[in-house]
């Protein structure tokens, strides 16, 4: 959604 690159991978 709109977090850090690390979070983006989990936010898919």
From Swiss-Prot:
It comes from the Eukaryota. On the 2D-gel the determined pI of this unknown protein is: 8.3, its MW is: 28 kDa. This is Unknown protein from spot P3 of 2D-PAGE of heart tissue. It comes from Rattus norvegicus. The lineage of its organism: Eukaryota, Metazoa, Chordata, Craniata, Vertebrata.
């Amino acid at each position: 959604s709109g977090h850090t690159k690390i979070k983006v991978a989990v936010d898919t």
